[in-house]
């Protein structure tokens, strides 16, 4: 067969380079990966014979279209236009304003339709020459003034008539009465007595404030007028008193809030200059027999999102909507998850831009540049060795085309990232250069999920993912009588029941579900089941997975208590930091100490290990290796409720063979452990979340599959066990979550030994001794600063700091037991509040910052505390403005309208729960209303008085909608 000429190879090479221009492939430069893409994706598109990869690479090199440096290939740079599609942003029309991007909330006032925003502007506007003025006037109709605690503050608001005709001032009244604010005048206007205001005249109205609480006290005040022959009109002002401690003032906004106005909708032309990737010391002997595709999204999908809904039945939006709204079933499994994952990726492209940096310097360190990235230590953004970002010169921001320098991550230390850029940039680098930086995200999790969704039905998993019955076949001929590894499991009826059903395999081919509410020993039960399978079936091969490294490490640690390390192999991802691997896990993980790198042994070398432990995404490596059918007899997934369904399926499709009485009688057991009432996966795409990606496999089965439905007699123990004994929380802390989420079935375990859960029942700070709960009411202000869209509330931080001081300074006295900072956790749903609380504790407050080990006190979001517990939990809810509640619901923020987040937050505490928040705002949510009523009934409420607002006073927006503003 004749060989291809260089010209012919060049032609195919050009086609391959064009093929790589797809957004999901264009950043790839590793020679080995490019070879795989060429062989497995490009060449297989048609049956036409094509040159080898080495031939086209040679042709591109000699024609100066590519450069090869070792294992890295750099193709000639091409111009491209960058467009992103935000699914939170609707296309503009003449009558509506686009919804903000996630985290990109409006700059002032609550989110509202344009008509309502215009109404507020009209409400505060002077009319007919009448103006409202005071010494504390601020923009947008705001009057803000400082007050000191327990001292009356008085100032004057002047109603001035600058017009040519008299007007009548009928009344001055707040739309909602506030006990701190009162309004007085000589002629009784504040009591409804009319007053004629002649041209050039002014009338003073006194505003008085007296408060014994720090906070933010705001009333919207309406001045009602009439003028003949024009009729009545109104002018409004927002009058707010602010009582602050020095700490609160210090923690206030560092700069006025100015929302980040990203030019995301403006297509730009860029040229990419490739960088220098780190040298890979990875030893990968694990086979790659099943290819991993790139799974790019179609460009037309992005266009569909940008165009938005269309009324035409044959529009691309309607076609997409039809698939999204179709019930998930085996016939559309691949197509639906393919679409959901594409939508997720398109939104990820938008969201990663929140971390863009502008006008930032870098420092040269030999051949690398060092960049400070705030938040990288918390994976905000996530930056790992081998990832890449893009940097461009700030001075060339308006140039077209714009040169983007691709920088590969060589290492991450705290908040400093080491980057390898092209020699071209390094030659022009000087210390005073400023850069604009754009981050990227790792597509590997998306790729393995795409493959899993595609393989699921190919591998016959419909009876696993859509189970309808059991084969009624036990793995035991007689009665299973276990020798328990953990005696506490033996004493717990539900845990014992779950283990027995898992080991006998009576649910197969249907998965077995462990429904584990907070503190009920879900992971303990799962680990005992794994140990029993390992002990009872000498030919069993077990894959144990979890969504995160920390959860997978915990499985490994607990298994090692009874199983020798020679049977267990913990496979870490290549990006995992070895310093973070627990010491007792290191001897059985895939780190090669002599080579100082992770290794991935061949299937042959993995065979002696009967238990493999990985994260769900890393299980994709095992799928690529193509183990023989039936190799893994059991797959266990802990914390399954945290993962999107395709992520869980990564550990199933291609690894677990469906149980079959004839061909696979002893295998096919899938066990899922989790709690559908706690936080599930958090997709970035609102479309994907709404249509199934926000529901875990565990939750879908429990919600929509008859085998896992709860009857009057409870759950069918052949398929699911709900654990009932709570070992974590004091019964008072458990009561409300138990009622709201668990049908009041949970029982607080009471052992004979001294119980840590009772340690704070006699603490002097408790409003009611014996009830270790405090709800401290605060009337604060939702604030933002600079370009951060996240909210904070300094009034709540003050209270949190005061309680911390009492807990950590009164140890062993006044009923307060000895406690270390690491036994205390502080939860807040907003990133900026978390940052401000940390700043107060470690830097601003002189008492707390001087305490030893104060850095071990964890402050974080609800998501960061899921699966964890602390002796004491403090919660700062932040929200004090009911007008933002719809925003929280839209963007899945905060506690309100998010019962799962509330459930997780309340159930982290063992012995003491302190909640700080605005009761009037929180009570608008039915779940919070129940908790507040419980605190008040039990005498556990203190702080700012809590009075439920009447429905008619629920919203400023409602008032604006009903007002007659006049002209």
Swiss-Prot record:
GO biological process: 3'-UTR-mediated mRNA destabilization; miRNA-mediated gene silencing by mRNA destabilization; miRNA-mediated post-transcriptional gene silencing; positive regulation of mRNA catabolic process; regulation of neuron projection arborization; regulatory ncRNA-mediated post-transcriptional gene silencing; transposable element silencing
EC number(s) from the headed UniProt entry: 3.6.4.13
Main subcellular localisation: cytoplasm
Transmembrane intervals: none
Region (Disordered) residue spans: 85-117
Reactions performed catalytically: ATP + H2O = ADP + phosphate + H(+)
Keywords: ATP-binding, Cytoplasm, Helicase, Hydrolase, Nucleotide-binding, Nucleus, RNA-binding, RNA-mediated gene silencing
GO cellular component, as recorded: cytoplasmic ribonucleoprotein granule; cytoplasmic stress granule; cytosol; nucleus; P granule; P-body
Gene3D superfamilies linked: P-loop containing nucleotide triphosphate hydrolases
GO MF terms held by the record: 5'-3' RNA helicase activity; ATP binding; ATP hydrolysis activity; RNA binding
Record-listed ATP binding positions: 516-523
Motif (DEAG box): 638-641
Record localization: Cytoplasm, P-body; Cytoplasm, Cytoplasmic ribonucleoprotein granule; Cytoplasm, Stress granule; Nucleus
Main enzyme class: hydrolase
Pfam families: AAA_11 (PF13086), AAA_12 (PF13087), MOV-10_beta-barrel (PF21634), Mov-10_helical (PF21635), MOV-10_Ig-like (PF21633), MOV-10_N (PF21632)
Record field: compositional bias (Low complexity): 98-107
Cross-referenced PANTHER family: BRCA2-INTERACTING PROTEIN-LIKE-RELATED (PTHR45418:SF5), CANCER/TESTIS ANTIGEN 55 (PTHR45418)
Job description of the protein: 5' to 3' RNA helicase that is involved in a number of cellular roles ranging from mRNA metabolism and translation, modulation of viral infectivity, inhibition of retrotransposition, or regulation of synaptic transmission. Plays an important role in innate antiviral immunity by promoting type I interferon production. Required for microRNA (miRNA)-mediated gene silencing by the RNA-induced silencing complex (RISC). Required for both miRNA-mediated translational repression and miRNA-mediated cleavage of complementary mRNAs by RISC.
Homology family: Belongs to the DNA2/NAM7 helicase family. SDE3 subfamily.
Name of the protein described by the UniProt record: Putative helicase MOV-10
Protein's gene: MOV10
């Amino acid at each position: 067969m004749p060989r291809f000429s260089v010209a012919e190879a060049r032609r195919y090479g050009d086609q391959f380079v064009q093929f790589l221009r797809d957004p999901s492939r264009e950043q790839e430069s590793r020679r080995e990966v490019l070879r795989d893409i060429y062989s497995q994706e490009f060449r297989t598109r048609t049956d036409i014979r094509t040159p080898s990869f080495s031939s086209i690479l040679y042709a591109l090199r000699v024609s100066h279209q590519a450069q090869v440096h070792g294992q890295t290939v750099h193709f000639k740079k091409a111009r491209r236009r960058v467009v992103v599609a935000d699914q939170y942003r609707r296309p503009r029309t003449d009558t509506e304003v686009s919804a903000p991007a996630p985290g990109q909330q409006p700059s002032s006032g609550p989110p509202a339709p344009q008509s309502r925003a215009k109404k507020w502007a009209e409400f505060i506007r002077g009319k007919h020459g009448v103006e409202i003025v005071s010494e504390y006037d601020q923009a947008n109709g705001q009057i803000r003034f400082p007050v000191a605690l327990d001292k009356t503050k008085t100032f004057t608001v002047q109603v001035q008539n600058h017009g040519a005709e008299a007007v009548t001032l009928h009344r001055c009244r707040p739309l909602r009465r506030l006990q701190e604010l009162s309004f007085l005048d000589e002629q009784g206007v504040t009591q409804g007595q009319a007053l004629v205001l002649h041209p050039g005249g002014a009338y003073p109205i006194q505003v008085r404030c007296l408060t014994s609480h720090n906070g933010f006290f705001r009333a919207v005040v309406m001045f009602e007028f009439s003028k003949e022959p024009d009729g009545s009109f109104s002018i409004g002002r927002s009058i707010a008193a602010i009582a602050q401690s020095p700490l609160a003032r210090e923690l206030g906004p560092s700069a006025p809030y100015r929302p980040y106005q990203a030019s995301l909708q403006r297509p730009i032309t860029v040229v990419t200059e490739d960088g220098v990737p780190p040298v890979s010391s990875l030893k990968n002997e694990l086979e790659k027999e099943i290819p991993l595709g790139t799974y790019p999204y179609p460009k037309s999908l992005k266009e569909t999102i940008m165009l938005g809904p269309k009324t035409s039945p044959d529009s691309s939006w309607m076609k997409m909507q039809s698939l999204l709204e179709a019930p998930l079933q085996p016939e559309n499994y691949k197509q639906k998850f393919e679409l959901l994952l594409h939508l997720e990726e398109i939104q990820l492209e938008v969201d990663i831009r929140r971390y863009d940096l502008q006008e930032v310097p870098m420092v040269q360190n030999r051949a690398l540049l060092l960049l400070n990235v705030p938040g990288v230590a918390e994976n905000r953004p996530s930056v790992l060795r081998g990832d890449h970002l893009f940097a461009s010169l700030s001075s060339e921001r308006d140039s077209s085309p714009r040169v983007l320098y691709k920088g590969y991550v060589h290492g991450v230390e705290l908040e400093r990232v080491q980057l390898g850029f092209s020699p071209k940039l390094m030659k022009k680098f000087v210390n005073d250069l400023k850069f604009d930086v754009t981050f990227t995200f790792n597509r590997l999790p998306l790729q393995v999920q795409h493959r899993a969704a595609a393989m699921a039905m190919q591998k016959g998993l419909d009876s696993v993912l859509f189970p309808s019955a059991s084969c009624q076949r036990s793995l035991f001929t007689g009665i299973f009588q276990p020798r328990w590894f953990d005696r506490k499991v033996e004493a717990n009826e539900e845990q014992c029941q779950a283990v027995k059903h898992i080991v006998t395999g009576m649910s197969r081919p249907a998965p077995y579900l462990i429904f584990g509410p907070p503190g009920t020993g879900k992971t303990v039960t799962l680990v005992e089941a794994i140990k029993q399978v390992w002990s009872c079936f000498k030919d069993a091969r077990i894959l144990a997975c979890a969504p995160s490294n920390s959860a997978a490490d915990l499985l490994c640690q607990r298994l090692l208590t009874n199983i020798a390390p020679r049977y267990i192999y913990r496979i870490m991802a290549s990006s995992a930091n070895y310093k973070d691997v627990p010491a007792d896990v290191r001897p059985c993980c895939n780190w090669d100490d002599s080579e100082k790198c992770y290794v991935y042994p061949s299937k042959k070398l993995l065979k002696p290990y009967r238990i493999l432990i990985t994260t769900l995404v890393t299980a994709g490596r095992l799928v690529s290796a193509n183990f023989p059918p039936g190799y893994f007899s059991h797959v266990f997934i802990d914390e399954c409720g945290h993962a999107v369904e395709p992520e869980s399926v990564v550990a199933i499709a291609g690894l677990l063979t469906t149980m079959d009485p004839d061909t696979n009688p002893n295998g096919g057991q899938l066990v899922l452990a989790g709690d559908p009432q706690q936080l599930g996966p958090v997709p970035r795409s609102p479309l994907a979340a709404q249509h199934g990606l926000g529901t875990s496999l565990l939750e879908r089965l429990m919600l929509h599959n008859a085998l896992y439905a709860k009857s009057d007699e409870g759950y069918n123990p052949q398929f699911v066990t709900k654990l009932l004994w709570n070992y974590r929380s004091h019964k008072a802390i458990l009561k409300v979550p138990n009622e709201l989420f668990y049908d009041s079935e949970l029982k607080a375990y009471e052992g004979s030994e001294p119980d840590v859960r009772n340690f704070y029942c006699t603490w002097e700070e408790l409003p009611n001794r014996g009830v270790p709960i405090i709800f401290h009411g605060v009337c604060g202000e939702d604030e933002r600063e600079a370009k951060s869209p996240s909210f904070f509330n300094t009034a709540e931080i003050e209270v949190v700091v005061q309680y911390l001081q009492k807990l950590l300074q009164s140890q062993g006295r006044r009923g307060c037991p000895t406690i270390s900072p690491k036994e205390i956790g502080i939860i807040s749903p907003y990133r900026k509040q978390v940052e401000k609380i940390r700043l107060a504790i470690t830097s601003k407050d002189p008492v707390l910052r001087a305490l030893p080990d104060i850095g071990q006190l964890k402050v974080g979001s609800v998501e960061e505390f899921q699966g964890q517990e602390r002796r004491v939990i403090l919660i700062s809810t932040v929200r004090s403005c009911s007008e933002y509640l719809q925003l929280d619901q839209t963007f899945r923020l905060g506690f309100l309208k998010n019962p799962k987040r509330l459930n997780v937050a309340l159930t982290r505490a063992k012995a003491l729960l302190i909640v700080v928040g605005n009761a009037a705002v929180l009570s608008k949510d039915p779940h919070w209303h129940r908790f507040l009523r419980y605190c008040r009934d039990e005498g556990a409420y203190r702080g700012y008085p809590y009075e439920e607002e009447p429905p008619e006073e629920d919203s400023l927006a409602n008032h604006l909608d009903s007002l007659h503003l006049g002209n």
